[in-house]
C-alpha cells in the first residue's frame, strides 16, 4: 500500500507552503508542531519535515525540529540543509527515522557516498527534477542551481548504494497541478530502491494514480498543499490509497 507523508515545511518556526519552492511565495499555516501533531492525530504514520530556512541557506530551525520529532510518536523524514557532517549528525540526533540529502548529493559526491555508506537506509536522496528542452536536469540549493543530468546522477547514486529516492518535479511542486507519473515511473524502473513521489498532488485521484505505480517501486507520496488547502482530508487520502 502507498505510504502517505504529510509535509510540514518550516520557515522561522512556522508551517508554510511555497509555490515551486520559491522564497517569498509562502502561505502560513500556524506552528510547525501543531501542524505535525495534527497529521499524527489524523492517522499519518510518517511526517515529511523540511527546514526551508536551512535549505535556502538563511539560518535553521534545528532546535525546533528536534522538539517536533521528540513530541511525535510517528516516524519523521527530515529534510533541508543537510550538507555536511555537522548538519547530518544534528539531523540524525533528533531521532528522526531518516534524512533526505538534496544539494549535498549533487555538489559533494564523495561526502554523499560516505553518508550513504555509514548510515544506510537512514539516508535518502532528494532528486529535484526540472525538464528543460526535453532534458531531465536536477536542481540544487532551493532549486536555484543546475545539478546535472538526472540519469547520470542516478547512475552514480546507484553505484554508491543509495537506499531510497524522493523524486520531485519542481514545475509541479505547490501548484496542485497533478504529479508527473511518467517521471516517477521512469526513475522507479531504473532502480531497485524505493521511490517516494513529491509535488503536484491535488486530488484523491492523483493519489490513486501514484498508487498504481507501487508495483514498479513507488513506495510513498508526500502530500502538502492539497491537505493544507482542504482539497481532501488525510483520512480520506489514507482510505483512497487503501482501496
Curated annotation (Swiss-Prot):
Main location, first listed in the record = cytoplasm
Taken from the UniProt entry, a GO cellular component term is: cytoplasm
Q: What is its EC number?
A: 5.3.1.16, 5.3.1.24
Q: Which Gene3D superfamilies match?
A: Aldolase class I
Keyword Amino-acid biosynthesis attached? yes
Q: What GO biological process term is on the record, naming one? A: L-tryptophan biosynthetic process
Specify whether Signal is a keyword of the entry. Answer: no
InterPro entries from the UniProt entry: Aldolase_TIM, His_biosynth, HisA/PriA_Actinobacteria, Isoase_HisA-like, Isoase_HisA-like_bact, RibuloseP-bd_barrel
Q: In which pathway does it act?
A: Amino-acid biosynthesis; L-histidine biosynthesis; L-histidine from 5-phospho-alpha-D-ribose 1-diphosphate: step 4/9; Amino-acid biosynthesis; L-tryptophan biosynthesis; L-tryptophan from chorismate: step 3/5
Superkingdom per UniProt: Bacteria
Catalysed transformations (reactions): 1-(5-phospho-beta-D-ribosyl)-5-[(5-phospho-beta-D-ribosylamino)methylideneamino]imidazole-4-carboxamide = 5-[(5-phospho-1-deoxy-D-ribulos-1-ylimino)methylamino]-1-(5-phospho-beta-D-ribosyl)imidazole-4-carboxamide; N-(5-phospho-beta-D-ribosyl)anthranilate = 1-(2-carboxyphenylamino)-1-deoxy-D-ribulose 5-phosphate
Q: Which keywords accompany this UniProt record?
A: Amino-acid biosynthesis, Aromatic amino acid biosynthesis, Cytoplasm, Histidine biosynthesis, Isomerase, Tryptophan biosynthesis
| Pfam families referenced in this protein's UniProt entry, alphabetically | His_biosynth
Q: One GO molecular-function annotation for this sequence?
A: phosphoribosylanthranilate isomerase activity
Query: What compartments host this protein?
Result: Cytoplasm
Which residues participate directly in catalysis?
Answer: 9 (proton acceptor), 128 (proton donor)
Recorded family membership: Belongs to the HisA/HisF family.
What HAMAP family does the record point to?
A: HisA (MF_01014)
Name the job this protein performs. Involved in both the histidine and tryptophan biosynthetic pathways.
- What is the protein's name according to its record? Phosphoribosyl isomerase A
Which gene name does the record give?
priA
Amino acid at each position: 500500500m502507498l505510504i502517505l507523508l504529510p509535509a510540514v515545511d518550516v520557515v522561522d518556526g512556522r508551517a508554510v507552503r511555497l509555490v515551486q519552492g520559491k522564497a517569498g511565495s509562502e502561505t502560513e499555516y500556524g506552528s510547525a508542531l501543531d501542524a505535525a501533531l495534527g497529521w499524527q492525530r489524523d492517522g499519518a504514520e510518517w511526517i515529511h519535515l523540511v527546514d526551508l530556512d536551512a535549505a535556502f541557506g538563511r539560518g535553521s530551525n534545528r532546535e525546533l525540529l528536534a522538539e517536533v520529532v521528540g513530541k511525535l510518536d510517528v516516524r519523521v523524514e527530515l529534510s533541508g540543509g543537510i550538507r555536511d557532517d555537522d548538519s547530518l549528525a544534528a539531523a540524525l540526533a533528533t531521532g528522526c527515522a531518516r534524512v533526505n540529502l538534496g544539494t549535498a548529493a549533487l555538489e559533494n559526491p564523495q561526502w554523499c557516498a560516505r553518508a550513504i555508506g555509514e548510515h544506510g537506509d537512514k539516508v535518502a536522496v532528494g532528486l529535484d527534477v526540472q525538464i528543460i528542452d526535453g532534458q531531465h536536469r536536477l536542481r540544487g540549493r532551493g532549486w536555484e542551481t543546475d545539478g546535472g543530468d538526472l540519469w547520470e546522477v542516478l547512475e552514480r547514486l546507484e553505484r554508491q548504494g543509495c537506499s531510497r529516492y524522493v523524486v520531485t518535479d519542481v514545475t509541479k511542486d505547490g501548484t496542485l497541478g497533478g504529479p508527473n507519473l511518467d517521471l516517477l515511473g521512469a526513475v522507479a524502473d531504473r532502480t531497485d530502491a524505493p521511490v517516494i513521489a513529491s509535488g503536484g498532488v491535488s486530488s484523491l485521484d492523483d493519489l490513486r494514480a501514484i498508487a498504481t505505480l507501487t508495483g514498479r517501486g513507488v513506495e510513498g507520496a508526500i502530500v502538502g498543499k492539497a491537505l493544507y488547502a482542504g482539497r481532501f482530508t488525510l483520512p480520506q487520502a489514507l482510505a483512497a490509497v487503501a482501496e
